[in-house]
Swiss-Prot record:
A GO MF term: manganese ion binding
Catalytic activity as recorded in UniProt: 2-C-methyl-D-erythritol 4-phosphate + NADP(+) = 1-deoxy-D-xylulose 5-phosphate + NADPH + H(+)
Family: Belongs to the DXR family.
Name this protein carries in UniProt: 1-deoxy-D-xylulose 5-phosphate reductoisomerase
Gene that encodes it: dxr
Disulfide bridges in this chain: none
UniProt lineage: Bacteria, Bacillati, Bacillota, Bacilli, Bacillales
Provenance organism: Brevibacillus brevis (strain 47 / JCM 6285 / NBRC 100599)
Residues annotated to bind Mn(2+): 149, 151, 220
Pathway: Isoprenoid biosynthesis; isopentenyl diphosphate biosynthesis via DXP pathway; isopentenyl diphosphate from 1-deoxy-D-xylulose 5-phosphate: step 1/6
Length: 382
């Protein structure tokens, strides 16, 4: 049985992970979970899945959770950054699902690696910020990192049984996000509500905004570089409006392997959790006859300048991608709060990245320092 430590249980990926666990109680159990401050939902999750250890965002949330569970069988309750790491390395867990949002995922992912856990990685910011440190340590510890992002899961599946030296390139598909049919001029006036209406996927607020700016795809390019040890020149992005082909791998003989399916995050979540076995999943089957036509278009890097910037930062290496991620987190948060306009996200991120001198071969402390600097700079650059 897979005994799961779940980081980010109340988020989009976290709740979908628990749905998968609930559908296969004979195969999966949750022994530890971490959430932020959504105590209403977390209380229900704790009562349903009965973990041994629970971490919340702060001490106030910990007190509230204890009060909610008064008179019932209670798990050990911890909080904060230390609590996240305790969940990640919980002794009873043999699989850690990292589904928290943002660079907060770096430390618990490293804690899980040090503890020798198999990792289902749904937190792309971990590799964007700290890819060289995380992947080096995972290799040293012999830890498997199985991607949960639909695109990277697709590539991972297409690579099974193949040799990496036979890969010509990987092709990441992108829906184009909420505003794919709008001109740059139209983007000046878009609202938060419009930006949160993704055409194909149901996701959290930040990743939906990142999809609209195409920053999400930029992060996926950087993540793919680290996951599959490929140079950026071998990672291509293409627009695919239906989100049916999740990604592709082209080999040296020009054969192309693709993974298709209806847009449902439970598919890559369950694949990571049950790997290398596939289990039945009650989701809508793919009906190609009903779909009839799939559409593709070349990526427009002038239309999506943050994707272009992600390639630039990735190729620059070092701490540049940590700064890219931190500046984007600040800018998206400000947009969601109504403090800046949609296109200001791009301006804040580029201005911050251009001001960064960078550390070429960073240690973890250098990455955290770059992250902190970028957040401060981005705030005053608005």
């Amino acid at each position: 049985m897979k005994k799961i430590a779940l980081l980010g249980s109340t988020g989009s990926v976290g709740t979908s992970t628990l749905e998968v666990v609930g559908q296969h109680p004979e195969d999966f159990s949750v022994v530890a979970m971490a959430a932020g401050t959504n105590i209403d939902l977390l209380t229900l999750q704790v009562e349903t899945f009965k973990p041994e250890l629970v971490s919340v965002g702060n001490e106030k949330a910990a007190v509230e959770l204890r009060d909610r569970l008064a008179g019932k069988s209670q798990p050990e309750i911890v909080y904060g950054a230390e609590g996240l790491e305790l969940v990640a390395r919980h002794e009873a867990a043999n699989f850690v699902m990292t589904a928290v949002v943002g660079s907060v995922g770096v430390a618990p992912t490293l804690a899980a690696i040090e503890a020798g856990k198999t990792i289902g990685l749904a937190n792309k910011e971990t590799l964007v910020s700290a890819g060289p440190v995380v992947m080096k340590r995972a290799k040293e510890k012999g830890v498997s990192i199985i991607p949960v992002d639909s695109e990277h899961s697709a590539v991972y599946q297409c690579l099974q049984g193949e040799r990496m030296e036979d890969v010509a390139k990987i092709i990441l598909t992108a829906s184009g996000g909420s505003f794919r049919h709008l001109s740059r001029e139209d983007l000046e006036q878009v609202t938060v509500e419009q930006a949160l209406a993704h055409p194909n996927w149901s996701m959290g607020a930040k990743i939906t905004i990142d999809s609209a700016t195409m920053m999400n795809k930029g992060f996926e390019v950087i993540e793919a570089h680290w996951l599959f040890d490929l140079p950026y020149e071998q990672i291509e992005c293409v627009l695919h409006y239906e989100s049916i082909i999740h990604s592709m791998v082209e080999y040296k003989d020009r054969a192309v392997m693709a993974q298709l399916g209806t847009p449902d995050m439970k598919v890559p979540i369950q694949y990571a959790m049950s790997y290398p076995i596939r289990k039945k999943l009650p989701t809508e089957p793919l009906d190609l006859v009903k779909i009839a036509t799939l559409h593709f278009a070349a990526m427009d890097y002038e239309r999506y300048p943050l994707l272009k910037l992600a390639y630039e930062c990735g190729m620059a290496g070092g701490t540049h991608t940590a700064v890219l991620n931190a500046a984007n987190e600040v800018a998206v948060d400000m947009f969601l709060k109504g403090a800046i306009r949609f296109l200001d996200i791009e301006k804040v991120v580029r201005k911050t990245c251009e001001a960064h001198s960078g550390v070429a071969s960073p240690e973890l402390a250098d990455i955290f320092a770059a992250d902190e600097w970028a957040r401060s700079y981005a705030l005053v650059s608005i």
